[in-house]
Amino acid sequence: VSGGGYRVERYAVEALPRDAVTDGNIANLEAVAEAIRRGWRRLNTSTRFVALALPASAVITKKIILPAGLRDQELEVQVESEANQYIPFALDEVNLDFQVIGPAASGADEDEVLIAASRKEKVEDRVAAAEAAGLKALVMDVESYAALSAFELVQAQLPGHGEDKIIALVDAGAN
């Protein structure tokens, strides 16, 4: 895509045994890895790098306000300090990430920052399934944020960016 954007060139959908994933948790790692392998073979691609996503139910997110202009290391310290207030687990039990969203609504030299935390085993299970399928995870996202990012990519390709159109993003889920 011109302008350095992304596009979906191929995709695959594979059925999982009923017991493979329960309540968003991988219960049968080998069954999930095998489904990933089958799908990957159908894609006929040489890349081994993938982006993964966690269900929103497995992630705690919170928007916080921090002073604007912090260096990366200062920002990390502040985020960890704030995260202790909102995450009901010890920080060594979670994977923690953050994204500066932009200036806070107060506009008083503050930034709005989104923090996201998930239990390490939730992240590690998904990474293990990808690795068991011979792939390397480069990105871990939240399903709803990944869907929004995909939607924005599609919207940007619509005539007039979809202005004056009704556009829906539907997540039908699975059971």
Regions inferred by a protein language model and the residue ranges of each:
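Short glycine-rich, Thr/Ser-proximal phosphate-binding strand/loop in the N-terminal lobe
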Residues: 1-26, 64-69
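Generic structural signal for well-ordered secondary structure
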Residues: 7, 14, 29-33, 45, ...
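Phosphate/pyrophosphate-binding loops at sites that engage ATP/ADP/AMP, CoA/4′-phosphopantetheine
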Residues: 36-49, 133
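Solvent-exposed loop and beta-edge segments used for protein-protein assembly and interaction
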Residues: 44-46, 107, 173
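Active-site neighborhood for divalent-cation/phosphate handling
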Residues: 49, 53-159
